[in-house]
């Protein structure tokens, strides 16, 4: 039992240490892609739904770190979020405009129920939209 707990803690620490530093990204290109493409995908998925969960970030690299995490990692009740069009386009933008961006292995969500809980997905999508807004307002 102690060994399993130690392995779990080690896994968490390794994942935390393997996060990408988004400071070398081409923010101008990513901003254009967001404004012209990703924004429309996000608002289309939300279909006008609004949620009060608000999380901001202090800089463009910090925003991209949160955007990547919330967009590309499945959450309980919404395992298919990383497969949405806006998520695929976000992944492409990061791959194309962040030198050396290593997409880490993602949890594929197979442990999750097959049926999504619509409200959870909409809430997560709303949070991602807010983070993109914060990205647009943040200094480099």
Swiss-Prot record:
Which Gene3D superfamilies does the record cross-reference, listed alphabetically? Thymic stromal lymphopoietin
A Gene Ontology term for the protein's cellular component:
extracellular space
Instruction: List all disulphide bridges recorded for this chain.
Output: 25-98, 57-63, 78-121
Record's InterPro entries?
TSLP, TSLP_sf
Which Gene Ontology molecular function entries are recorded, alphabetically? cytokine activity
What superkingdom heads the lineage?
Eukaryota
Q: A Pfam family for this UniProt protein? A: TSLP
Function text: Cytokine that induces the release of T-cell-attracting chemokines from monocytes and, in particular, enhances the maturation of CD11c(+) dendritic cells. Can induce allergic inflammation by directly activating mast cells.
What protein name does the entry list?
Thymic stromal lymphopoietin
Q: Which organism is it from?
A: Mus musculus
The primary gene name is Tslp
């Amino acid at each position: 039992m102690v060994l399993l707990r130690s392995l779990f803690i080690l896994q968490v620490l390794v994942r935390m240490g393997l996060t990408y530093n988004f400071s070398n990204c081409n923010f101008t290109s990513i901003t254009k892609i967001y404004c012209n493409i990703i924004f429309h995908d996000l608002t289309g998925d939300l279909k006008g739904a609004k949620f009060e969960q608000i999380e901001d970030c202090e800089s463009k690299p910090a925003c991209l770190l949160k955007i990547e995490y919330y967009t590309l990692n499945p959450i309980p009740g919404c395992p298919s979020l990383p497969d949405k069009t806006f998520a695929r386009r976000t992944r492409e933008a990061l791959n194309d405009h962040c030198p050396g961006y290593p997409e880490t292995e993602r949890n594929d969500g197979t442990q999750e129920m097959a049926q999504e809980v619509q409200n959870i997905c909409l809430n997560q999508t709303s949070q991602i939209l807010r983070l993109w807004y914060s990205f647009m307002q943040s200094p480099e």
